[in-house]
């Protein structure tokens, strides 16, 4: 418990300086320390730094964006051997960056994390993209003319996607036809957004495995990153209820309903609140 408490404190301190010290690697390593309290962060930071220097060298003679992307793909996927884990997609190790570095495999967002770090250091105009169901990377040439931008699928060896490809993926991921709205479906994800989505992936996995305490930790970290994430506040309330922490559950669920009005899960949330009242564990106003 002491080790986790220290990791929790370190993550809070990291969040406090995040807008000043722009460091994605530190953040994902702290998430890995949730699982591995004795993780040697310096070892993995040095490994990423070594990869970064190699990427800079590989891209030093490139000029165009296509040349840079091809060189980065050659280094990251072919030379280093990173690839998407399509055999066991929901293995939580795909989300812990230390495991991704050791095993050379991951899911879209964990591979994108490393790809972005290497690309940024090498002068690539890359951004993370919060595409539904499948994190992407964008080369953003211009914020005014999106036709000059490129979309990269790091889960599939850096394949460049057209907007038509992305439209087809959107329909597949959502299970229905929906018009692609770039301003909505292709929103940039800064460091906070990348960490938030990484934690959400782990939260979903651990909740499905019945590891409620782990899912609660991840939810609390998501709230540190985005305090007005009302869905995460609801989840914190539900996880707290499952763990018998009724006062926390009441506070979270009542605040969730207050902030969201009458959400789609209004009845279910009230059912939990009344279940606690029936046990005489809380008082409802």
Segments (PLM) and residue ranges:
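A structural boundary/capping signal
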Residues: 1-285
């Amino acid at each position: 418990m002491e080790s986790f408490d220290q990791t929790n404190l370190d993550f809070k301190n990291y969040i406090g300086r995040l807008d000043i010290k722009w460091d994605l690697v530190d953040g994902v390593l702290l998430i890995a320390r949730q699982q591995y309290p004795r993780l040697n962060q310096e070892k993995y930071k040095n490994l990423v730094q070594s990869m970064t220097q190699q990427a800079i060298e590989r891209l030093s003679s490139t000029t165009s964006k296509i040349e840079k992307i091809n060189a980065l793909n050659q280094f990251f996927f072919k030379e280093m051997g990173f690839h998407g884990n399509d055999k066991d997609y929901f293995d939580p190790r795909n989300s812990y960056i230390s495991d991704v570095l050791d095993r050379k495999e991951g899911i879209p967002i964990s591979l994108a994390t490393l790809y972005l770090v290497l690309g940024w250091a090498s002068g690539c105009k890359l951004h993370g993209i919060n595409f539904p169901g499948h994190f992407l990377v964008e080369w953003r040439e211009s914020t005014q003319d999106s036709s000059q931008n490129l979309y990269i699928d790091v889960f599939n060896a850096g394949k460049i996607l057209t907007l038509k490809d992305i439209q087809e993926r959107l329909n597949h991921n959502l299970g229905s036809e929906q018009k692609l709205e770039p301003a909505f479906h292709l929103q940039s994800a800064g460091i906070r957004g990348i960490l938030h989505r990484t934690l959400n992936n782990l939260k979903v996995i651990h909740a499905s495995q019945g590891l409620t305490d782990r899912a609660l930790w991840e939810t609390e970290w998501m709230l540190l990153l985005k305090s007005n994430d009302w869905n995460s506040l609801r989840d914190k309330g539900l996880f707290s209820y499952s763990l018998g922490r009724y006062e926390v559950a009441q506070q979270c669920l009542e605040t969730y309903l207050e902030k969201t009005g009458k959400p789609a899960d209004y009845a279910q949330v009230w059912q939990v609140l009344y279940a606690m009242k029936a046990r005489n564990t809380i008082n409802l106003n």
